[in-house]
UniProtKB/Swiss-Prot annotation:
Residues 174-239 form the HTH luxR-type domain. Induction: The rhlR promoter region contains four different transcription start sites, two of which are included in the upstream gene (rhlB) coding region. The rhlR gene is subject to a complex transcriptional regulation. Expression is dependent on LasR and on different regulatory proteins such as Vfr and RhlR itself, and also on the alternative sigma factor sigma(54). Expression is partially LasR-independent under certain culture conditions and is strongly influenced by environmental factors. It is found in: Cytoplasm. Quorum-sensing regulator that controls the expression of multiple virulence factors in response to extracellular signaling molecules called autoinducers. Involved, among others, in the transcriptional regulation of genes that are responsible for rhamnolipid surfactant biosynthesis. Acts by binding to a specific sequence in the rhlAB regulatory region, both in the presence and in the absence of its autoinducer. In the former case it activates transcription of the promoter, whereas in the latter it acts as a transcriptional repressor. Residues 198-217 bind DNA. GO terms for cellular component: cytoplasm; protein-DNA complex. This is HTH-type quorum-sensing regulator RhlR. PANTHER family: DNA-BINDING TRANSCRIPTIONAL ACTIVATOR DEVR_DOSR. Disruption phenotype: Disruption mutant shows defects in the production of rhamnolipids, elastase and pyocyanine. It also exhibits reduced LasA protease activity and casein-degrading activity. Keywords: Activator, Cytoplasm, DNA-binding, Quorum sensing, Repressor, Transcription, Transcription regulation. It comes from Pseudomonas aeruginosa (strain ATCC 15692 / DSM 22644 / CIP 104116 / JCM 14847 / LMG 12228 / 1C / PRS 101 / PAO1). Homodimer in the absence of any acyl-L-homoserine lactone. The presence of the autoinducer C4-HSL has no significant effect on dimerization whereas N-(3-oxododecanoyl)-L-homoserine lactone (3O-C12-HSL), the LasR inducer, is able to dissociate the RhlR homodimers into monomers. Transmembrane segments: none annotated. The gene is rhlR.
Length: 241
């Protein structure tokens, strides 16, 4: 059973240690130390941007072997990694297993070749609707049921504190080009997402169809989208409508 008093002392100590740090290098150094205290050799902090849908921008920082991180990025494994994809539908920690990687055998086999044999991944939603994940790994000693709850709680605290700290420091991993929509643009996008044509939207909003199309063009430029349908899909994915 977890020692709640010890856990609260640890959490208070971690926040106190992070509070005066003013650079990402110091933040990641504290994270690495805590990961080792938790019994793991490696960590990776990843951020998956929401768009584009087919090849979302994914950035990873951590102590995984450098060659493996480069390979992971080059192969765009972030788009198929089940430990990351789990975070799109759940905020629960996943422990790595053969069954988890059943549809991503090449990724799983390569990771183990690099000594990333035992691990866990925990996701959270970051600002701008980004997905942040914290993974920890070691080369042996399976995660026991006794360890699992302790790992889950500490990873949750670590990733929330880390993400907030990096956001405050405006770290590039967590920065995305903000899309600002006017009230009228948001209205038009909402109706577009509901399948309404420009003519129908014009009638609903009591404006001309040319005005609707004018707003559509401006919206598409803001999202760098080739058509209004994709612009509406991007806006929905980013939580703007």
């Amino acid at each position: 059973m977890r020692n709640d008093g010890g856990f609260l002392l640890w959490w208070d100590g971690l926040r106190s240690e992070m509070q005066p740090i003013h650079d990402s290098q110091g933040v990641f150094a504290v994270l690495e130390k805590e990961v080792r205290r938790l019994g793991f050799d490696y960590y990776a902090y990843g951020v998956r941007h929401t768009i584009p849908f087919t090849r979302p921008k994914t950035e990873v920082h951590g102590t995984y072997p450098k060659a493996w991180l480069e390979r992971y990025q080059m192969q765009n494994y972030g788009a198929v990694d089940p430990a990351i994809l789990n975070g799109l539908r759940s905020s629960e920690m996943v422990v790595w297993s053969d069954s988890l990687f059943d549809q991503s055998r090449m990724l799983w086999n390569e990771a183990r070749d690099w000594g990333l044999c035992v691990g866990a991944t925990l996701p959270i939603r970051a600002p701008n609707n980004l997905l942040s994940v914290l993974s920890v790994a070691r080369d042996q000693q399976n995660i026991s049921s006794f360890e699992r709850e302790e790992i889950r709680l500490r990873l949750r605290c670590m990733i929330e504190l880390l993400t907030q700290k990096l956001t405050d420091l405006e770290h590039p991993m967590l920065m995305s080009n903000p899309v600002c929509l006017s009230h009228r643009e948001r209205e038009i996008l909402q109706w577009t997402a509901d399948g309404k044509s420009s003519g129908e939207i014009a009638i609903i909003l009591s404006i001309s169809e040319s005005t609707v199309n004018f707003h559509h063009k401006n919206i598409q430029k803001k999202f760098d989208a080739p058509n209004k349908t994709l612009a509406a899909a991007y806006a929905a994915a980013l939580g703007l409508i």
